[in-house]
């Protein structure tokens, strides 16, 4: 043992403290249903409970874990609660948590193959597994012209797709001289907000983002897309990319990929497909129809951190021609040069993303797939969809309520027929109760309540209780009247 002074945690203490953390996490999951799903703290309350200055001397680990329980836990909205039905889920699981712990313990930085070969090769291999598991086009396999990479989120995947599309449309002139303001992107108004952010970052500009009208089911209209592309060409614009969605955030709408894909193919336009939430459903053969037309896509992404029990962050981003992505993003300073890179025999994922550094995200995904197996994952996806369909049926059978959009998978959009003010009050009452957490959207200007079934440990009793609580709070509001 060295006699040098050290403030590091000893290996013995690390073992003991690590066991305490695992026990704390396990206990948290055992008691998670005892907490209000939505945190009840007020703005600034957490900071007010913390010291104004950092400690000069180190504190015992027991004090840290005590303060997590006392100071931090009250400010947590419990995303892993089985009664969390808000937004889209950001679920986790025991194998994912353990895989992430190992990733943190190894502490690798996987920017290059050479900086940790296993980090790169496991990622490539697991993403190839997913192509097979989801029935994706073979062009997304690493053995083809394309391949996959793990991004932090679908937002980053969309940005990378737009950057690659921009360079292809300009013959890589934009990287050299910047954008001229003539590139145009297309998406439905239901597309994720990250599309708008990405066109700003990529230099296309929000005025060059065309929101194409949707049909009665909130899906993009192909004929309107074709008409807008023609108008833009006549005006001297350069159609650059179409961002289609399989399972929009507001309503789970499914854009018609076969028709959109043919339009993109005929016009030489990049097609990016965002299936962040719904993509996991394709694990089940009976739901793979959502991917019809994906053979036209130049890029595609879905989020295992939403519905495949792999804790945040983990987005799987695929491209049909990896050279186009790499050529758009690659920069090789001398300090990154190495024999493996220059051999051309390896993948350097730094060229597939905006940041240079990258975590070993594939490890937790590998753990999840190996723990559950394909059939285990399918079981839980099917169960979630069945529970959502049961909830949708209850809505349809109650004359006070109506479905606000089709419910093809695990998201149900509904509202009370009394109007927006009633629905806003209902949502507020439900969330204040702490018994569950729901969020809203607006469709055709109407206030809509969303319920998404996708949390790892959600069971039928939680969905049944959600419907009971909706009924109870509805009855109270109806008695109050004035709507």
Enumerate the predicted regions with their spans.
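Short Gly/Ser/Thr- and Asp/Glu-enriched loop/turn motifs at secondary-structure junctions
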Residues: 143-145, 180, 405-410, 442-448
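Conserved PLP-binding catalytic core of the aspartate aminotransferase-like
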Residues: 402-430
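PLP-dependent enzyme catalytic core of the Aspartate aminotransferase-like
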Residues: 443-483
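Conserved PLP-enzyme active-site core in the AAT-like
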Residues: 157-324
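Short loop-beta-helix segment that forms the pyridoxal 5′-phosphate
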Residues: 130-163, 210-213
């Amino acid at each position: 043992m060295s006699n040098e002074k050290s403030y590091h945690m000893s290996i013995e203490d690390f073992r003991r403290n690590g066991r305490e953390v695992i026990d704390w996490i396990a206990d948290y999951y055992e008691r998670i249903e005892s907490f209000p799903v939505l945190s009840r703290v007020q703005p600034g309350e957490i900071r007010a409970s913390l010291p104004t200055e950092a400690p000069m001397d180190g504190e015992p680990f027991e004090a840290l874990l005590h303060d997590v329980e006392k100071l931090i836990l009250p400010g947590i909205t419990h995303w892993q609660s089985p009664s969390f039905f808000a937004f889209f889920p950001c679920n986790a699981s025991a194998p994912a948590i353990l895989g992430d712990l190992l990733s943190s313990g190894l502490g690798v930085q996987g920017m290059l193959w050479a900086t940790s070969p296993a980090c790169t090769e496991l990622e490539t291999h697991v993403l190839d597994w997913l192509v097979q598991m989801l029935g994706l086009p073979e062009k997304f396999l690493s053995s083809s012209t394309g391949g996959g990479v793990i991004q932090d989120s679908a937002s980053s995947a969309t940005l990378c797709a737009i950057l690659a599309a921009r360079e292809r449309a300009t013959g890589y002139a934009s990287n050299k001289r910047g954008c001229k303001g003539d590139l145009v992107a297309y998406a439905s108004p239901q597309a994720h907000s990250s599309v708008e952010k990405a066109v700003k970052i990529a230099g296309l500009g929000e005025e060059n983002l065309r929101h194409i009208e949707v049909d009665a089911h909130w899906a993009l209209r192909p004929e309107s897309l074709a008409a807008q592309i023609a108008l833009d060409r006549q005006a001297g614009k350069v159609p650059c990319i179409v961002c289609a969605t399989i399972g929009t955030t507001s309503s789970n709408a499914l854009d018609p990929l076969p028709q959109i894909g043919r339009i993109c193919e005929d016009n030489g336009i990049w097609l990016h497909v965002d299936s962040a939430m719904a993509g996991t459903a394709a694990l089940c053969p009976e739901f793979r129809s959502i991917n019809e037309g994906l053979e036209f896509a130049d890029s595609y992404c879905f989020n295992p951190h939403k519905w495949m029990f792999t804790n945040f962050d983990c987005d799987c981003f695929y491209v049909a021609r990896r050279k186009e992505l790499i050529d758009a993003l690659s920069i090789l300073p001398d300090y990154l040069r190495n024999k493996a890179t220059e051999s051309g025999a390896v993948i350097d994922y730094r060229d597939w993303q905006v940041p240079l550094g990258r975590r070993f995200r594939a490890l937790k995904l590998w753990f999840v797939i190996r723990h559950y197996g394909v059939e285990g994952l399918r079981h839980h996806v099917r169960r979630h969809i069945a529970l959502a369909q049961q909830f949708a049926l209850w809505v349809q059978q109650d004359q006070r309520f109506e479905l606000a959009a089709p419910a093809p998978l695990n998201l149900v959009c509904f509202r009370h027929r009394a109007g927006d003010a009633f629905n806003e009050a209902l949502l507020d009452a439900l969330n204040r109760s702490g018994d569950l957490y729901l969020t809203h959207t607006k469709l055709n200007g109407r206030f809509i309540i969303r319920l998404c079934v996708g949390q790892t440990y959600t069971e039928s009793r939680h969905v049944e209780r959600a419907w009971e609580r909706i009924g109870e709070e509805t009855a109270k509001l109806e008695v109050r009247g004035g709507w």
